[in-house]
Each structure stands twice: as C-alpha cells, then as structure tokens.
Amino acid sequence: EQQRYLNAKKYVKLFLVADYIMYLKYGRNLTAVRTRMYDIDNVITPIYHRMNIHVALVGLEIWSNTDKIIVQSSADVTLDLFAKWRATDLLSRKSHDNAQLLTGINFNGPTAGLGYLGGICNTMYSAGIVQDHSKIHDLVAIAIAHEMGHNLGMDHDKDTCTCGTRPCIMAGALSCEASFLFSDCSQKDHQEFLIKNMPQCILKKPLKTDVVSPAVCGNYFVEVGEECDCGPPRTCRDPCCDAATCKLRQGAQCAEGLCCDQCRFKGAGTECRAAKDECDMADVCTGRSTECTDRFQRNGQPCKNNNGYCYNGKCPIMADQCIALFGPGATVSQDACFQFNREGNHYGYCRKEQNTKIACEPQDVKCGRLYCFPNSPENKNPCNIYYSPNDEDKGMVLPGTKCADGKACSNGQCVDVNTPY
C-alpha cells in the first residue's frame, strides 16, 4: 500500500493570498498583483513537477480593502493568525489543500517566510507566509516553494545536502541566486513524511475548471482549452500529444490516463485498477474515455470478519482507529467509558450544531468520542480520548463504523445499515 501511495501522482491545490500592503506596493493595481502571483505560480509548477507533484492554483485573493488578519513583522504571530483565518474562514468558502500568504511587510530579522513542518492536508497547519522580498519573481516563488516544502515534510538542508552546484531550495538561509532544485536530503525527508503520514488530500486531482490561473501549454497539466499537456516541446516524448499546441496528434483518441494505451482508448471492460481490499471493487474502462472510475462495494456489506461494515470503499472499525490514535498496543475501551458521550462536553458528545456539542442519546454513545485503552507502561487509564482544540473532530468515531450488530455510525447516530447513510 505504501508503494502504491508513493507511486501515485500527487496534486497540491494551492490558494494564494496577497495582503493590503502588496496591493499598495503595486500601485493599487489588481491586475499587476494578479500578474505577479501568476508569474510566481508558473515558477513553482515545474519545481514540484520534478517531485511528481502538480501544483494547481485553485484560488487567489487580494486584500484590496483591508487585511483580514493583523499582518505584523513577527512572522510567528502572522503565520498563526493566517492559519487560523484559513481554517475558520477561507476553507469554508473554497476547497483547497494549501494556502500561502504573500505580504509586502518586512519580517523581523533575516526571515523571508515561515511554514508549518508537515502541515499539508491539516485544517489548521497547511499554510505558510512569505515576504515579497525581491523584485525578481523567481526568488519570491522559490521562497514560497520553500515554505510549501516545509508543509510537505522537508526540513532545512544541512551542509552535506546537495542538488548540484547552487544552494538548494530548502537551504536555511536566503540566497540571491535562484535555485530550482530540491536536495537529496529534501527528497528523502519528503518520501519519509509521505510513507509515515500518507496525506490523502493530495491524491485528489483538481478539475480543469478548478484552476484559476491562465492556461499554460507546457506545464504538464491539462487545462481548459487543452486536450493534452506533455510539458515543453524540448522535453516532451509523448507520441500522442503535440507539445506546441497541447492538442492530440491526428488519429489519437487520448494521451494519458489509466484507460489510454498507445493513443487509443482501452476496450470496454478492461481492468484498469485492481481491488485494494474486500470493500473495494476492480475498476474497468468504459471504452469511451480515459477515466478509470473508482467503484466500491455497497455501504453496509460486512467486512473484517464481520467486525465492520464497508463504507465508501473502506472498512472502518474502532480497533484500527484506536491503534492509529494511540499506537500499536491500543485497544477499544470497555462499554462503560462510552457513557461519557452522554455529557455533551469536549470529552463526550455525538455531533455539533452551530458549534454546540450535542450529547449522545443512550443508543448512540458509540458514535461520539472514541474511547481507547493505550495499554502502555506510562498510561494505564482505561478510558482515554484523543482531544486537540485545533482539530476537535479528530478522535471522534469515524462515519460508517460498526456501533452494534446491523448498525453503523452516521452523523453521530447509530443507524441501521440497510438505511442509506
């Protein structure tokens, strides 16, 4: 499964924000600020393409009236404020994986940017901030690529790290020389981070219509108006795609995709993806497109020796959720612990309505907070929960989890598996 995850194409749906000082700096000219940000995006895209990651700009916001947070010269404080604003405001308006704030302010000391290490796909921490510190947009783009690198699990390079001659992207200090490569250490950091955390949001390919930047033929991503995109003409080796026009060559039906073979659609019924487990199904081609549509077993089908029920292609059971939260020795707590879910507080509730925690009904207690026994030398408490004020939903019993024979959790209630949920 790890190898399958590593080999999969990754997509970072990026949202860029420019603050009020940026707007003033570029003469209150929205077009100038937008152009600056598009130019930056066009530098970031090929940098990450080498890492098997496509960066798609899915949103752009310019604070042309007033800042939506207090942008200040303390980078730490500004990053925290920006991340909170993203989590509470931006995410509810526009779905994206990562947000970066470009500011015209001077940060204290030599800092040109800051980003949370390993924050990608996290509601609170998938964010960075960068100072518009140079007239040369390449250098600012590299600073954003650097902060995104932190979000993707990369630490600063040590002296022994190498990417060729220049300092690499994750160098600890700013360079006035542009470097477009990640070091061997960064690539190792990133791979280890992916294996350990397997962030899911970056597996989802954005739609052509999600991308807000002008279409660029040669950036490896098929955008509105393009039929294919195999990169710049000098490097494209795709016999199906005309790299100069991003159109299919004469006679070609397709250029890429799991249901495309030698520029033709694969036949209807051809298997394009094997079943991953008992809740998945083998996926097949239609013969009419390159898409390999993901199919899975119906919700409610028993799985894992009748310990769970299939839900959206997975088999969520409490035992696995306790191990994920507390480590390999953890087990599910005794039934008595789940009675805390009837209290309707931080430690026990079934769902939230307008941010109010709703206590569980007696029959629903196993669809609220998950109670686990860590079974470790330092923790012998039989009733443990995982609670983080920054991500209150983490540590709740997952939707679709078996809560009784013939029943599964749906929206904090223990419902019959034969009803749609």
Curated annotation (Swiss-Prot):
GO biological process, one term: apoptotic process
Coiled-coil region list: none
GO cellular component: extracellular region; plasma membrane
GO MF assignments: metal ion binding; metalloendopeptidase activity; toxin activity
Binding-site list for Zn(2+): 146, 150, 156
Record's subcellular location: Secreted
Disintegrin domain boundaries: 214-299
Swiss-Prot/TrEMBL cofactor(s): Zn(2+)
Superkingdom to which the source organism belongs: Eukaryota
Cofactor binding annotation: Binds 1 zinc ion per subunit.
Binding site for Ca(2+) 1: 216, 219, 221, 223, 226, 229
Residues reported to bind Ca(2+) 2: 280-281, 283, 294-295
Tissues and organs where the protein is expressed, per its UniProt entry: Expressed by the venom gland.
Main subcellular localisation: secreted
Domain Peptidase M12B residue range list: 10-206
Uppermost EC category: hydrolase
Disulphide bonds in the chain: 121-201, 161-185, 163-168, 217-246, 228-241, 230-236, 240-263, 254-260, 259-285, 272-292, 279-310, 303-315, 322-372, 337-383, 350-360, 367-409, 403-414
Similarity section: Belongs to the venom metalloproteinase (M12B) family. P-III subfamily. P-IIIc sub-subfamily.
Function in brief: Snake venom zinc metalloprotease that induces apoptosis in vascular endothelial cells (VEC), without degrading the extracellular matrix (it cannot cleave collagen) or inhibiting adhesion of VEC. Has also fibrinogenolytic and hemorrhagic activities.
Subunit structure comment from the entry: Homodimer; disulfide-linked.
PANTHER family the record matches: ADAM A DISINTEGRIN AND METALLOPROTEASE DOMAIN, DISINTEGRIN AND METALLOPROTEINASE DOMAIN-CONTAINING PROTEIN 28
Protein name per the record: Zinc metalloproteinase-disintegrin-like crotastatin
Organism: Crotalus durissus terrificus (South American rattlesnake)
